């Protein structure tokens, strides 16, 4: 990525942040672009994403991940089925004071995540190579986020053991899922649905917030 291209992407991040209601953050933008470069560099080796075009990666991965940042307020968060680190790494870059753990069962992807954590200097990130249903952390999380990881019902059932009571699931979905929301398990209750607007992306995006309402 040339210096001129970096300046253009920084300008787009500034504009996107204004639209999302986030402050401009030059240090975070620099790390996000470094992360984008790592995604592009290692994608062929690690098969991190089907997207090959760097501008499409910027829109569908970086901006899409940032679009949820104004809503997710969990201080200790786990990103399940994180793949190449989405949305976890962008959130960890934006909120260095929060703990963001990245879980995936694919060893190639977790190797990339370990490398990305080191190169980006993300001290608030831990990489977990595990199947989600078999992972039992010593300390429970107050937030679980996923990005098109599974059906909403599967997400809740596979991850409820990771979450504190009164903690929240944050499910990023490509479209409204009324049927899924109407059939929540008894340990979960609907909180809010946020409609997301990602610059340069002509597609529906929603963030579903669900509260864990009892011990299971």
UniProtKB/Swiss-Prot annotation:
EC number: 2.1.1.170
UniProt: S-adenosyl-L-methionine binding residues: 81, 86, 132-133, 147
GO molecular function: rRNA (guanine-N7-)-methyltransferase activity
Group of enzyme by EC: transferase
Disulfide bond positions: none
Pfam families: GidB (PF02527)
Keyword terms: Cytoplasm, Methyltransferase, rRNA processing, S-adenosyl-L-methionine, Transferase
Compartments, as annotated in UniProt: Cytoplasm
Coiled coil: none
Keyword Cytoplasm set for record: yes
Catalyzed chemical reaction(s): guanosine(527) in 16S rRNA + S-adenosyl-L-methionine = N(7)-methylguanosine(527) in 16S rRNA + S-adenosyl-L-homocysteine
Domain of life: Bacteria
InterPro entries attached to this UniProt entry: rRNA_ssu_MeTfrase_G (IPR003682), SAM-dependent_MTases_sf (IPR029063)
One GO location term (cellular component): cytosol
CDD domains: AdoMet_MTases
Record family assignment: Belongs to the methyltransferase superfamily. RNA methyltransferase RsmG family.
Role according to the record: Specifically methylates the N7 position of guanine in position 527 of 16S rRNA.
PANTHER family: S-ADENOSYL-L-METHIONINE-DEPENDENT METHYLTRANSFERASES SUPERFAMILY PROTEIN (PTHR31760:SF0)
Protein name: Ribosomal RNA small subunit methyltransferase G
